[in-house]
Amino acid sequence: YYLASVDTSEGSAGIPVIWGTDAVHGHNNVIGATLFPHNIALGAAGDPALTAGIAAATAREVSATGIDWIFAPTLAVAMDPRWGRTYESYGSEPDLVRQFAGGVVDAMQGEGIVATAKHFIGDGGTHQGIDQGDTRLSKEDLLSVHGQGYVSAIEAGVMTVMASFNSWNGDKIHGNQYLLTDVLRGELGFDGFVVSDWNGIGQVSGCEP
């Protein structure tokens, strides 16, 4: 893919492709890679240094397979155990998630791999724990609870942020200029690349595939 992307012999602009992978508990899509506990177990262990070491080891194994980008860490604050993706969260305490976020980003990007803070924002706080549901909070509560990990990740220089499938007070996060531009960039100071989740743009009105 990479060689084809930079080939300009037939008039292509030669823009190099970048490939990302969900290495969320080790390089879990590769047979023989080291698998680690999911985030909920790491949060329970309460050891940010251990978690950063796991992130660095994961990044090295991802790099060894020629991939430059990891879709991690997940910075959800899981507020309802009925949410089916609770295992992806470090826990239900915003301060705990914040403690882990920056170190994981530093560890991954210190190994030359692009990290992704995800899923912005409020995926762990949907009404009744419904996956891809509606997070019904004021902006202040949204940021004070579900934004703390992003503050830490951005301070650590995270290069990418992934938009979330959920809605905020009835409006889909994908395509939400206020949250993805005004808040994420204008207020939180993120200056990197925002990526959609899997076909997330297909959930935006007028953008159906």
Describe these PLM feature segments.
Residues 1-209:
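Glycoside hydrolase catalytic-domain context in secreted enzymes
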